[in-house]
Amino acid sequence: MFRRSLMFMISNNKNTNMVSSINTTNKVNNFSKIIILEGNISAGKTYLSSKLGDLLGYKVFLEPTATNPYLSLFYKEPSKYALIMQKWLLNQRYNTFLNALQYSLENEQGVILDRSVYSDWVFAENCRSEGLISAEGFKEYNSIRDRFLSNIPIPNVTLFLDVDPKQCLQRIQNRKRDCEQSIPLSYLSGLDNCYKKFLIEMKSKGSNVIILDWNNFGDINLVLNEINNDNFNNFNNSNNSKFNDVNYKKQQLISDIENEKNNLKEMKFFLNENNNNNNQEKIKS
């Protein structure tokens, strides 16, 4: 069931709720862990994240596809909407990560993210490789992504559901979402290739990566064992040194997150059609 080609430490602490409150346990290195659940379209992420959340007592944060104003447009005219949609999704996923991080700090509780700001790159890179995002547009995207990632910790755990693209296509056809029916196999295969590169990146960053063969789904209890039988470091390989600073207070970090969320509300670049190098029609932000 499991392929462990990219494997390292995950928490073996079965007690998911810390006893101490923020006021008494206020050092950054007392975080509960952050898990990101990744995989191709229709790999089974949402179902598994919900089940793991229930069993671990973790809060689940879903990706913002339900409110994506560009998704159906992208599937119909990918070259027109690729960059603007990826910048919108990058912004939304960053905001979701900030919310999850703040929740974990305030509640001393682990969190699971169904996709993340980290894996947003997979979709952008796939669009770039297919010629849907120009080199200049991709450079712009990466500059935004780098800025976002510099403000957040690296996830403790990266769970990847490894599903053959043909199987993903079959599941897409079976769930019959209108906006997805035009997705070609080549697009899913491209995402699969980009995800493999992404996992190497996450390993190099210091996240704890487990690859799960999910072609026939799997036993959730075995997934739990994989998580609980390993150890994890708090943010020892973080993008930002403050997550490793034992003297940095949780309340200060929460304040930093709030400030960043407020800053994000003021950012309009992700909807700025003037910077879209694919000559998209102007959409009001």
From Swiss-Prot:
<feature type="active site" description="Proton acceptor">
    <location>
        <position position="114"/>
    </location>
</feature>
<feature type="binding site">
    <location>
        <position position="75"/>
    </location>
    <ligand>
        <name>substrate</name>
    </ligand>
</feature>
<dbReference type="GO" id="GO:0004138">
    <property type="term" value="F:deoxyguanosine kinase activity"/>
</dbReference>
<dbReference type="InterPro" id="IPR050566">
    <property type="entry name" value="Deoxyribonucleoside_kinase"/>
</dbReference>
<dbReference type="GO" id="GO:0045271">
    <property type="term" value="C:respiratory chain complex I"/>
</dbReference>
<feature type="binding site">
    <location>
        <position position="180"/>
    </location>
    <ligand>
        <name>substrate</name>
    </ligand>
</feature>
<dbReference type="GO" id="GO:0005737">
    <property type="term" value="C:cytoplasm"/>
</dbReference>
<dbReference type="Pfam" id="PF01712">
    <property type="entry name" value="dNK"/>
</dbReference>
<feature type="binding site">
    <location>
        <position position="120"/>
    </location>
    <ligand>
        <name>substrate</name>
    </ligand>
</feature>
<protein>
    <recommendedName>
        <fullName>Deoxyguanosine kinase</fullName>
        <ecNumber>2.7.1.113</ecNumber>
    </recommendedName>
</protein>
<keyword id="KW-0808">Transferase</keyword>
<feature type="binding site">
    <location>
        <position position="86"/>
    </location>
    <ligand>
        <name>substrate</name>
    </ligand>
</feature>
<comment type="function">
    <text>Purine-specific deoxyribonucleoside kinase that phosphorylates preferentially deoxyguanosine, as part of the deoxyribonucleotide salvage pathway.</text>
</comment>
<feature type="binding site">
    <location>
        <position position="115"/>
    </location>
    <ligand>
        <name>substrate</name>
    </ligand>
</feature>
<dbReference type="InterPro" id="IPR002624">
    <property type="entry name" value="DCK/DGK"/>
</dbReference>
<dbReference type="GO" id="GO:0005524">
    <property type="term" value="F:ATP binding"/>
</dbReference>
<keyword id="KW-0418">Kinase</keyword>
<keyword id="KW-0963">Cytoplasm</keyword>
<comment type="similarity">
    <text>Belongs to the DCK/DGK family.</text>
</comment>
<dbReference type="GO" id="GO:0005739">
    <property type="term" value="C:mitochondrion"/>
</dbReference>
<dbReference type="GO" id="GO:0006180">
    <property type="term" value="P:deoxyguanosine salvage"/>
</dbReference>
<feature type="binding site">
    <location>
        <position position="63"/>
    </location>
    <ligand>
        <name>substrate</name>
    </ligand>
</feature>
<keyword id="KW-0067">ATP-binding</keyword>
<dbReference type="InterPro" id="IPR027417">
    <property type="entry name" value="P-loop_NTPase"/>
</dbReference>
<dbReference type="InterPro" id="IPR031314">
    <property type="entry name" value="DNK_dom"/>
</dbReference>
<feature type="binding site">
    <location>
        <begin position="39"/>
        <end position="47"/>
    </location>
    <ligand>
        <name>ATP</name>
    </ligand>
</feature>
<dbReference type="GO" id="GO:0006120">
    <property type="term" value="P:mitochondrial electron transport, NADH to ubiquinone"/>
</dbReference>
<keyword id="KW-0547">Nucleotide-binding</keyword>
